[in-house]
């Protein structure tokens, strides 16, 4: 089945900005996260599709390659972003690995003599709250991975069984072939790349030297992370073949949407409702922050949409430095469920303001614009 356009997956146009891409990813990843849709295969596939799209569009270089070549730019790379098919997938190999596999490490031949295959890199998606993202936290996770077999200690052979060098590839694990001017390499079909022949394979791991195991890990998430950030846990991926080094584990962060705050980079945004009397006369109101409440002075004659900046109450960068700001947007509330007395008072206020444009600057500005529009329309 043909892959969907990555922009279409995120619901974006091709010219979308970096912030548009990040916002779309956060919204969709939160909506389709497996924790919120347990047991839903459709949600799981959609979540993988969203992550794959963001791995490419969220990276400037990969996005440029995708814009020019489409999916063909990554067809040989083992999956977007280097993940070989998701959580349990293959490594982060690039073009160097591709050419090494094709030409044995270079155009002159000289292929690998010892078959050492590093373990696969793994991916784990974790969802945290905004508070945890801003302040940092520790999370215990459980992953399933290939680990060294306890029975044979990675040899792949039963105790006392002979392990001989493969006679087909002479222990290299690879077969070299001459094709014109080029020397190519392929995995040995006899030993399947191990470089050895086992007389009696280990019954626990069937000769692989590795078995699937569950592993518990404690992950320290630094303060200031955001959705899409990745934490690399070196050596916590799958065990390598034949004693080769293990791969790495990449923990991908997803920050849940907050009931009050919306994050944009290092700044936090929130809406603050105020009464129309406070908007007219001014006053003081309590506003929330992630560190507790603080008082904000509202000047007289404040209009809906006015922004107030509270410095240093945003998010600090994981790399250090100053915290961003909290931006409060004022929303003037219209009173509801009024009794007759209250309605009479408002009518008297309305009558006292009638015909006095200085009391209604926005309305008068709007009416002037309408008059000018129709006046200019009549001249054409």
From Swiss-Prot:
Signal peptide: none annotated. Zn(2+) 2 binds at residues 166, 169, 188, 191. A zinc finger (CR-type) spans 136-214. Binds 2 Zn(2+) ions per monomer. InterPro entries: DnaJ, DnaJ_C, DnaJ_domain, DnaJ_domain_CS, HSP40/DnaJ_pept-bd, HSP_DnaJ_Cys-rich_dom, HSP_DnaJ_Cys-rich_dom_sf, J_dom_sf. Keywords: Chaperone, Cytoplasm, DNA replication, Metal-binding, Repeat, Stress response, Zinc, Zinc-finger. One of its GO terms (molecular function) is heat shock protein binding. CXXCXGXG motif repeats lie at residues 149-156, 166-173, 188-195, 202-209. Pfam families: DnaJ, DnaJ_C, DnaJ_CXXCXGXG. CDD domains: DnaJ (cd06257), DnaJ_C (cd10747), DnaJ_zf (cd10719). Its main location: cytoplasm. GO terms for cellular component: cytoplasm. It is found in: Cytoplasm. Zn(2+) 1 binds at residues 149, 152, 202, 205. Its cofactor is Zn(2+). GO terms for biological process: chaperone cofactor-dependent protein refolding; DNA replication; protein refolding; response to heat. Residues 5-70 form the J domain. The J domain is necessary and sufficient to stimulate DnaK ATPase activity. Zinc center 1 plays an important role in the autonomous, DnaK-independent chaperone activity of DnaJ. Zinc center 2 is essential for interaction with DnaK and for DnaJ activity. Participates actively in the response to hyperosmotic and heat shock by preventing the aggregation of stress-denatured proteins and by disaggregating proteins, also in an autonomous, DnaK-independent fashion. Unfolded proteins bind initially to DnaJ; upon interaction with the DnaJ-bound protein, DnaK hydrolyzes its bound ATP, resulting in the formation of a stable complex. GrpE releases ADP from DnaK; ATP binding to DnaK triggers the release of the substrate protein, thus completing the reaction cycle. Belongs to the DnaJ family. Homodimer. This is Chaperone protein DnaJ. It comes from Actinobacillus pleuropneumoniae serotype 5b (strain L20).
